[in-house]
C-alpha cells in the first residue's frame, strides 16, 4: 500500500490517493471526520481553526461504504481558499501581493528557495505548511478502519509541553485514561499538569513566542511478526520512525524506553521472556516498546515524538531579505502558539498507516476475507 497527497495550505483543496488498500473493508466516514476534528482541536491553536471545519469527501475506491480494491481518492476542501483565490489560482493570479522574501528561521522557507531557485518563499511555505497533515490524518483514519477489524487500537496523548511534564503514573493498559484524554484541551491525562501547560502556552502567546513538547502514541493488540529483521527498509521501528519524523516540527523519535536505554545497564533494559501454556510467550516489562529486531513482538507498541516550537513567531527573529540581502525581521504568517496536541493526532495517523501497511504485507491479501483467513491461520491455532 502507498499514498500520495497534494495541495497547498491556501489552495482550493487537499487531495490524497491511496493505492493497495484491501477490498471489502467497511468505511465509516464519521470516524474519519472525528479524527480530523481532533486534529483541529487543542489549546494554543491559531485563528485558522475558526475558519476550517475539515470534512473528508471520498471520490473513488469506496462503494456503498465498502472499499473496492481500486485506488481510494479523498478530498478535503480549504474554506479559506475564497480569501486566497486571487493569490493562489493555478492558472492566473497575483504573485506580488503575498510575496514572502524574508525567510523564517526553522522553516522550509530558505532551504526551499535555495533548492528550487525561488525569490519568493510563498510556493515553499504553501506546501511545507502543516495544513498538509489534514490529509495524512484522513488517510491514517482510513487505515484505522482496517486495523480495528483485527482488534488493533491506537491512542494518542500529550506527555509534555514547554518543559511541563505529566506526573500521573499510567500503564499502556489504562485505556480509559487515554479515551478520556480526548475530552482534554491538550489531550492530557494529568489535569494538574494540563493547567500548568496552559499557563506556559498563555505566556508564550503573550510574548509572541511558541512552545513545543512531547506526544505519545500507544498501539494495543498488535500481533507479533509485523516488520522484518532481514533488510534495513523492512524494520518496523525504522518505518515508524521515518513516518513520524516526516511530520512537521518533529525533531526526535523514541520507542519504548527510548533514549533512557543509553543510561542503563543491559540487565535493566531488556525484557525477560516467559512462557505459559495458556498465553504462550509473554513479558513482564515492555522497555522495548513492542518491537525487537525490527519485528513486533506482540507487546504494546509505544512511540514518542519531540515537537519543536513552531517557527512562525509573532515577535520575529532576525533574518535576511532575499531582495537586497539586508538584515530584516522574519516574515509572519498566521500560525499556532502550540500544535503539540494536534501533532499527537497526526502522529497517530502516521503510525496507523505504517501498521496497516505492515499488516497487509504480513497477511498478504487483496481483500479483507483473505486477510482474515490468513490471520486465523497464523494467530488462532
From Swiss-Prot:
Pathway as given in its UniProt record: Metabolic intermediate biosynthesis; chorismate biosynthesis; chorismate from D-erythrose 4-phosphate and phosphoenolpyruvate: step 7/7
Catalytic activity: 5-O-(1-carboxyvinyl)-3-phosphoshikimate = chorismate + phosphate
Domain of life, per lineage: Bacteria
Needed co-factor(s): FMNH2
Keywords: Amino-acid biosynthesis, Aromatic amino acid biosynthesis, FAD, Flavoprotein, FMN, Lyase, NADP
Residue numbers binding NADP(+): 39, 45
Disulfide bonds: none
Binding site for FMN: 127-129, 248-249, 293, 308-312, 334
NCBIfam families according to UniProt: aroC, PRK05382.1
Subunit (UniProt): Homotetramer.
Name of the protein described by the UniProt record: Chorismate synthase
Protein's organism: Caldicellulosiruptor saccharolyticus (strain ATCC 43494 / DSM 8903 / Tp8T 6331)
Amino acid at each position: 500500500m502507498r499514498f500520495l497527497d497534494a495541495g497547498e495550505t491556501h489552495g482550493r483543496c487537499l487531495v490524497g490517493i491511496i493505492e493497495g488498500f484491501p477490498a471489502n473493508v467497511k468505511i465509516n466516514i464519521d470516524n474519519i471526520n472525528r479524527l480530523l476534528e481532533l486534529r483541529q482541536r487543542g489549546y494554543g491553536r491559531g485563528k485558522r481553526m475558526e475558519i476550517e471545519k475539515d470534512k473528508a469527501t471520498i471520490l473513488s475506491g469506496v462503494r456503498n461504504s465498502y472499499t473496492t480494491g481500486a485506488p481510494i481518492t479523498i478530498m478535503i476542501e480549504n474554506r479559506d481558499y475564497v480569501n486566497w483565490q486571487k493569490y493562489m489560482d493555478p492558472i492566473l493570479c497575483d504573485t506580488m501581493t503575498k510575496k514572502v522574501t524574508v525567510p523564517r528561521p526553522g522553516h522550509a522557507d530558505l532551504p526551499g528557495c535555495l533548492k528550487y531557485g525561488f525569490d519568493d518563499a510563498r510556493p515553499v511555505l504553501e506546501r511545507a505548511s502543516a495544513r498538509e497533515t489534514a490529509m495524512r490524518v484522513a488517510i491514517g483514519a482510513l487505515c484505522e478502519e482496517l486495523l480495528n477489524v483485527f482488534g488493533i487500537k491506537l491512542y494518542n496523548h500529550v506527555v509534555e509541553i514547554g518543559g511541563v511534564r505529566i506526573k500521573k503514573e499510567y500503564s499502556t493498559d489504562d485505556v480509559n485514561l487515554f479515551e478520556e484524554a480526548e475530552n482534554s484541551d491538550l489531550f492530557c491525562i494529568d489535569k494538574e499538569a494540563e493547567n500548568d501547560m496552559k499557563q506556559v502556552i498563555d505566556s508564550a502567546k503573550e510574548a509572541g513566542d511558541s512552545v513545543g513538547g512531547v506526544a505519545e502514541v500507544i498501539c494495543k493488540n498488535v500481533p507479533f511478526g509485523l516488520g522484518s529483521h532481514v533488510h534495513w527498509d523492512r524494520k518496523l521501528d525504522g518505518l515508524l520512525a521515518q513516518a513520524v519524523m516526516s511530520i512537521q516540527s518533529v525533531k526526535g523519535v523514541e520507542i519504548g524506553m527510548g533514549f533512557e536505554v543509553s543510561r542503563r545497564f543491559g540487565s535493566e533494559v531488556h525484557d525477560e521472556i516467559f512462557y505459559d501454556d495458556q498465553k504462550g510467550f509473554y513479558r513482564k516489562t515492555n522497555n522495548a516498546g513492542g518491537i525487537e529486531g525490527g519485528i513486533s513482538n506482540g507487546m504494546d507498541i509505544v512511540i514518542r515524538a519531540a515537537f519543536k516550537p513552531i517557527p512562525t513567531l509573532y515577535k520575529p527573529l532576525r533574518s535576511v531579505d532575499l531582495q537586497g540581502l539586508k538584515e530584516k525581521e522574519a516574515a509572519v504568517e498566521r500560525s499556532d502558539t502550540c500544535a503539540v496536541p494536534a501533532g499527537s493526532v497526526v502522529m497517530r495517523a502516521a503510525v496507523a498507516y505504517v501498521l496497516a501497511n505492515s499488516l497487509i504485507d504480513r497477511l498478504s491479501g487483496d481483500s479483507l476475507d483473505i486477510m482474515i483467513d490468513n490471520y486465523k491461520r497464523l494467530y488462532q491455532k
